């Protein structure tokens, strides 16, 4: 499949004669309904297509890093991290690898149905037209799950569609990055087919001072393909059909550390833009994940397999229906309903003796949410107000943990958990006041929630000598928050936004240390000496105070951008987790900074971005700290003929040691070292 996708990507370098009607009148957009006016009251940042296409890495997670306070659980990206660590969050609501920010693509939730992480290699940058990041919870308009905020990805629409686009670049460590797309436009619609492929021999994740004979480079190979067709089916109505497939294979730098992901998505959205606006969406997602795990001895001379997660099938399906009744000038109302149903299980071989497994585990279940929502905006003179409410019904069903002995088939763990259900009421209110020309005051209050993932509920796991037990009794997480800030636009093309906020997330899910090996512990079995026993638990709360600044300026051919976030997250815990009270959640830096400059001229275009991440704790007990890091990425584009440009890119220009993990033995894993790319782009 990989070779086929690569051939498709490179085929984008040939002309597409079928696009001769590209100048015809386009009456469809490929978009959803218009943005809500009440969004003016929120902390909102928009990333345009120009920036999406011109990052140093050409990867979505690098583009999202422009938004200070956006974070994944680990600092490493989707070329070397284990996929399960790539949940996404905002505003210091961290300490957990599941996503606490809601990520949607054209209205479809994108978190993995089983584990809540994000399959970043499935999002080729060339397919995206715009990214909207709304910080703060309570965004019930897009569904449940927006604790920390909402990240909306929009596919390329009619305006940005081009007959031919393609790029190919060769990089450090035998890396290859290729994308391509073909587009066809007609008066009644458009179609786009695209593919992307990336591979590399990888770097050695363990830093040189800690390496042993067992350590080796961590290669990766990733591919995706996408088909999107948009057709007018009535004078004011269009149908949008999308299908995507991806594969992802990575190794973590030792034997028995490979993990793979694959998935297929299909979605149908119908949008009506008549007097009564409306849209209907239906989608289905299938996923599978595999991962091997190894124990490394203290001298790092041997790797011994400890677990083979050989099959993790998961399915998500859902839909939404929304109407926008005509209520007159200054009033916008959206009413709707949605549902998302998830199922999945992990199948694992564990307890290896003489290199062979002797036990089998199956763990999984089903979860679902169904909700009603209303979102209203009022524009009256200098005041814009927003009021949103959402009522959800949730269910957790068919939960199980089954463990058997391979030799006899005899079960030794048979746990079937009681079904649970409940309701959640959430909402948001906000106000924006135009106090003067170019000066807007903003405030908002909100409440959001998230259902635990199947992974958190039912799957125990091990990382090296440490073992973490699942918890089928986890409660949903709930956040309450308040924002206040302003947006200043002193001149055309200049914008500065400042926001202060407070969030309290009740029933915070965290991996809580309960004991140390050697010993036998509930839910995981034996933990060897030097290993820790943890369990997923609901802490009392996580409180975060913070503030953020976003600024941009367009000065002729030069554009400046900057984003800063400072947070003070504090755990509130009692009972078995009382030792965590007053500590900071793991993997949560207090300060984030991103700043960049872009130049677009006749002879060349260039971009440079600097990012700083403050130190953060590796563990829940705040005993080990990852050092602060500053990285610089850059890009240069030089046109050679019309539609063809040469490109040079560099990631981590000064080869900063970006620490991604720190073991109890002091072994440091790093994120991406300096990586240089040289290639070409075409666009017709």
Which residues does each PLM region occupy?
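Short acidic/polar hinge/loop motifs at secondary-structure boundaries
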Residues: 108-135, 217
